[in-house]
Amino acid sequence: MSVKNISSAILGVGVDDTTIDLFESQYPVPTGVSYNSYVIRDEKIAILDTVDDRATDEWLANVTEALAGEKPAYLVVHHMEPDHGANVARLAALYPEMQVVGNAKTFQYMEQFFGAEAIAKERRVVVKDGESLSLGAHTLTFVFAPMVHWPEVMVSYESTEKVLFSADGFGRFGAVAKFDEKADWASEARRYYLNIVGKYLSLIHI
């Protein structure tokens, strides 16, 4: 997957992984998976989520292309599971002036994954449920979504273009490049929901 234009300002920089055979080492994924990540270009540039270590090089190439020589102001971390957050520390090291946005639990998990010094406290933007971050013409509003499917998960809504960045909330097995509109799209979405999110239904309050 190369850089995709979601809109004139929102770019998809995620990566398809068609070599993986088991998601989380237990769920068969014959058509692979996609690691979703985005860049919002505005007065302040934001990168939304990273990707799994399996896809680091391709993802960094996509990010570099999307940035077009500019530097990001923010990295927004919706979810710390490795398929979303494995490259947080690596990106922070590449862009030392970039701030990292997450909630309090996000940074607890980050320290467990990367160590307390990976993201200096002065670089952390700790958001609360319902708070917003302005990038210029675009604004992200954060909504906590605990147990979809880890305790720290949050989603963000961009109000100008009306785009929801939903973390695992509307996930589906299968790489984007392998998506067939004629196939039963719902079956893989249903299988993902039941196996990844559904087991926590009693704990979900959104």
Language-model region placement:
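Short catalytic-loop micro-motif centered on adjacent basic/acidic residues
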Residues: 46-49, 73-77, 141-142
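Metallo-beta-lactamase
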Residues: 4-8, 101-153, 200
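Active-site gating loops and adjacent loop-to-helix segments of metal-dependent hydrolytic enzymes
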Residues: 173-196
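Active-site environment of divalent metal-dependent phosphoester hydrolases
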Residues: 80-85, 107-110, 149-150, 171-174
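Conserved beta-strand hairpin/beta-sheet module of binuclear metal-dependent hydrolase folds
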Residues: 3-65, 155-158, 162-166
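Short, solvent-exposed beta-strand-terminating loops
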Residues: 21, 164-180
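Conserved small/polar residues in nucleotide/adenosyl-binding loops
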Residues: 205-206
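Active-site metal-binding motif and surrounding structural segment of the metallo-beta-lactamase
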Residues: 43, 54-101
